[in-house]
Amino acid sequence: MSKLFTPYNLSGLALKNRVVMAPMTRTRTMNDVPDEVVALYYAQRASAGLLITEGMPVSEEGRGYLYTPGIYNDEHVQGWRKVTQAVHAKGGRIFAQLWHVGRMSHVSLQPGHIAPVSAGTVQAVNTTVFALTESGEPGPVVPSQPRALETHEVKRITADFAHSARLAMEAGFDGVEIMAANGFIFDQFLSSELNTRTDEYGGSVENRQRFLLETIDAVAEAVGNSHVAVRLSPFGRIYDLAPYEGEDQTWSAITDALGQRELAYVHLYYQPVYTKAPLPEG
């Protein structure tokens, strides 16, 4: 605690203290573009050394909750620039969290009301997302049945993340955090229960982690590895995630792979509220 309020160098980024505000989904952006109220919200919290934003969908397809601000077009850049300027004016630093929910979405949120996408076709049933109910009102609904991505579509999503990372830096962010936790699209590919693919993104641990690692590498190439972080929730059970065969080996392999990449940081989220999954020693 004696060092909590002392400066810290985060991969070349000077933080005024070691307090970090974790990302929190707010669903307060009615037109999906951040406004002055969003800027005020983050500026009020800029006394922390580092802020991590709420999840920002990298595409319309990646959205799983109403009123979440995106980062995939020029209008988003203009809106988020107000936020970064407000935070920097208070001496704060801020990373943008890049997000694709995969199967954790609903047809009412998808372009053309089509099925959300995932590694496979297993529906998340013991959970809800914030979308439009049958009456057209905002509320909790069970995620829709997903469809499995084609191989070329997986690569397109990787490109979406890289594009959004570039836009985030253009908007003035100090870096980006890839959301690979909490049962969203990367968790869906890592799970051998959900990922039954037979292409280069399914089967072995090496193949199931390929999507995440290719995305990390693409984002790092786009904006520089010192501006890139990743959030993981090993052995998480939130959003209808279940144990799967080879789970220990999967997370061990991810750890080894990340150790070879000089990222800004790795953000781990432990979910004791949601699960009592046994964790391996160490």
Predicted features and spans:
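Flavin-dependent oxidoreductase catalytic cores
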Residues: 1-282
